[in-house]
């Protein structure tokens, strides 16, 4: 239906989808960005929601959305044409208070076991970059946190805002300073949609430079947890 923009939304990112409207539509920065793009195109918006980013990526192959709001990741680029990022979230580790680790780089050592949410952008990143440490995967962030506690693993990989919440729930744990990556949250189109991609790309550039994105960060109460994307 050319009068409707089908949008793939990842409900698993609680910073970008912060709630639900009375009509059941998702609420937050990601839905607001998508709605603004639909408005620019002069068409209606329809949200197709998924529990995890991996499911959003899988749905691209089935043609279930026109634009998807999901973190940029080389593996996902096989099925998605990414535009530039609009926000970024830094990723680090949560470790036990008594851990010898003092900075992010210390964690990649032989024998180290890291709990991680399966197929999260930082799981894909760490899978490519870790030389020695072993990733132990669980379903979703809550699952990775439980695994970390239950199995007494050496570290929990995650995004700073979520790890802060985990640390508050787990006395005797601390976040390592620094980051191993910043997850870039972007908007992508399915392959073979160059005209739509051009519109989205132009919209993001304007939204970042005009302060529209920062305004959404403030509006949805995630200031200090999300940052407007940088080019690095």
Q: Where do the language-model regions lie?
A:
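A ligand-binding cleft/hinge motif common to bilobed small-molecule-binding domains
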Residues: 54, 70-79, 125-128, 149-181
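Periplasmic-binding protein-like
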Residues: 11, 87-98, 160, 164-205, ...
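Alpha-to-beta junction loops
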Residues: 6, 42-44, 61-70, 111-113, ...
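Short loop->beta-strand "edge-of-pocket" segments that line small-molecule binding or catalytic clefts
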Residues: 4-11, 27, 105-120, 134-135
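Ligand-binding clefts/hinges and TM-proximal coupling segments of bilobed small-molecule sensing domains
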Residues: 121-138, 175-176, 205-232
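Flexible hinge/capping segments at coil-to-helix
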Residues: 84-86, 95-113
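Short helix-initiation/N-cap motifs at beta->coil->alpha
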Residues: 31, 46-58, 101-102, 136-150, ...
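Extracytoplasmic small-molecule ligand-binding "clamshell" domains
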Residues: 1-71, 76-78, 210, 219
């Amino acid at each position: 239906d050319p009068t409707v923009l089908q949008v793939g939304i990842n409900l698993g990112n609680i910073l970008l989808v912060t709630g639900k409207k009375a009509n059941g539509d998702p609420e937050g920065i990601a839905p607001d960005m998508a709605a603004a793009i639909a408005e620019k195109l002069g068409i209606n918006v329809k949200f197709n929601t998924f529990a995890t980013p991996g499911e959003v990526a899988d749905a691209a192959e089935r043609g279930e959305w026109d634009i998807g709001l999901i973190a940029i990741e080389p593996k996902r680029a096989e099925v998605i044409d990414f535009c530039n990022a609009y926000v970024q979230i830094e990723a680090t580790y949560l470790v036990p208070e008594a851990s010898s680790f003092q900075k992010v780089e210390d964690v990649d050592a032989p024998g180290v076991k890291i709990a991680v949410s399966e197929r999260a952008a930082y799981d894909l990143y760490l899978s490519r970059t870790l030389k020695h440490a072993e990733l132990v995967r669980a379903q979703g962030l809550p699952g990775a946190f439980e695994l970390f506690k239950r199995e007494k693993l050496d570290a929990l990989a995650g995004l700073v805002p979520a790890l802060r919440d985990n640390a508050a729930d787990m006395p005797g744990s601390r976040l390592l300073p620094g980051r191993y990556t910043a997850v870039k949250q972007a908007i992508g189109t399915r392959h073979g949609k160059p005209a739509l991609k051009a519109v989205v790309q132009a919209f993001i550039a304007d939204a970042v430079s005009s302060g529209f994105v920062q305004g959404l960060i403030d509006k949805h109460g995630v200031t200090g947890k999300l940052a407007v994307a940088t080019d690095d």
